[in-house]
């Protein structure tokens, strides 16, 4: 069984905010890429209408996710001026410490019970 944690955060992007949203997300991506070797996946996706975005992430474990949270958590206030979270799902074995950090975001947790990771 893997210790990896995967996320799917869904956002509604504010009207006339797409350009600013994309620019700000680029800053978050750069911060993540430069400082987090244990963040395995950090991908933003936007629908064709430009009003919904998804952030997909995979971390080696809870500690890697906490490191990510420390690196970009201070950026959330600005992110939320461009978009609001409409769904937050976390898949995998999350530590109690990580849950305390994520609970204010209204996260729904899913524990791994079967499958393979390669």
Residue ranges and their predicted role:
Residues 1-53, 60-71, 81-118:
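Short S/T/G/P-rich N-terminal loop/turn motif that feeds into the first structured element of a domain
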Residues 73-77:
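A short, acidic, amphipathic alpha-helical segment used as a generic capping/interface helix at domain edges
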């Amino acid at each position: 069984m893997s210790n990896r944690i995967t996320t799917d955060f869904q956002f509604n992007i504010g009207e006339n905010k797409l350009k600013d949203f994309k620019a700000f997300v680029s800053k978050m991506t750069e911060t993540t890429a430069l400082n987090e070797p244990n963040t395995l996946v950090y991908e933003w996706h936007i629908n064709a209408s430009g009003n919904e975005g998804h952030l997909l992430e995979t971390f080696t474990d809870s500690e890697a996710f906490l490191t990510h949270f420390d690196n970009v958590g201070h950026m959330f206030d600005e992110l939320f001026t461009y978009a609001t979270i409409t769904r937050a799902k976390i898949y995998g074995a999350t530590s109690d410490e990580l849950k305390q950090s994520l609970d204010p975001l209204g996260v729904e947790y899913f524990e791994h019970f079967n499958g393979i990771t390669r």
